[in-house]
């Protein structure tokens, strides 16, 4: 807004702002590893006195948090992890807690941004990610309140992903029908749920850092293009089916790494 401090991040995502507690909202940008332009990406950060501030998918999820349960508890992250100051990328392989933090942050990003891409392509709209983090938080909180334990694992399941996607499609007036016309067919909805689940559960820290990066780069690059293709009706059916049968091959071919 006018009169508020603003800045731009450098190519490494580093930024400087006045050292006083304030909410931080970022718009746009690209993924530094994959080079993908992240159209209408919006990330958020609640006001904090921390001198080192990390704006991420998890701080954006917490920005939507209106309850009394913190994100670490909701997603079973170790209490030593400070999502507001610990960089989820640079800490990879320093500890099992740091690896889980990286995985959860990447998964939350994919769940929010993939649905943003699908909805915006389907509705010819330009919603930013804030709305989708809010929907995702609501789904997570509802499952937590219903007694689901170990939500960091549960967000990888069909039960969670299907319910979350259904709620997003409904909130954006995208209904199911037997034809593609103005709505989407039930088969497209099923395909979307399937490929999102396949990618979310694939995201993890591997012993080989090249494999870890390849999975994440694929998830923030080619996978998003496939989501958009599903939305506009140009997706290749064989390729979409491969997400369930042979995702490793898709990633290896796209990222030029060994499939094993």
PLM regions and their residue ranges:
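Feature for extracytoplasmic/surface-facing segments of secreted or surface-associated proteins
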Residues: 1-260
């Amino acid at each position: 807004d006018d009169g508020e401090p603003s800045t731009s991040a450098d190519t490494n995502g580093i930024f400087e702002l006045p050292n006083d507690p304030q909410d931080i909202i970022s718009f746009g940008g690209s993924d530094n590893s994959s080079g993908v332009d992240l159209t209408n990406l919006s990330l958020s950060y609640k006001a904090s006195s921390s001198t080192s501030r990390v704006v991420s998918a998890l701080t954006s999820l917490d920005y939507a948090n209106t309850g009394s349960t913190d994100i670490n508890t909701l997603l079973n992250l170790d209490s030593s992890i400070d999502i507001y100051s610990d960089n989820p990328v640079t800490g990879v392989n320093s500890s099992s807690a740091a690896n889980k933090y990286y995985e959860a942050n990447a998964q939350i990003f994919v769940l929010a941004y993939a649905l943003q891409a699908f909805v915006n392509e389907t509705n010819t709209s330009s919603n930013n990610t804030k709305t989708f983090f809010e929907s995702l938080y609501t789904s997570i909180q509802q499952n937590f309140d219903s007694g689901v334990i170990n939500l960091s694992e549960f967000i990888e399941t069909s039960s969670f992903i299907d319910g979350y996607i259904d709620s997003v499609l409904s909130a954006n007036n995208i209904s199911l029908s037997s034809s593609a016309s103005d709505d989407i067919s039930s088969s497209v909805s099923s395909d979307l749920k399937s490929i999102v689940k396949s990618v979310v559960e694939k995201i993890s820290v591997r012993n080989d850092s090249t494999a870890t990066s390849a999975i994440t780069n694929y998830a923030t690059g080619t996978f998003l293009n496939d989501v958009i293709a599903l939305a506009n009706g140009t997706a290749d059916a064989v390729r979409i089916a491969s997400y369930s049968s042979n995702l490793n091959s898709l990633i290896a071919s796209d990222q030029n790494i060994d499939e094993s």
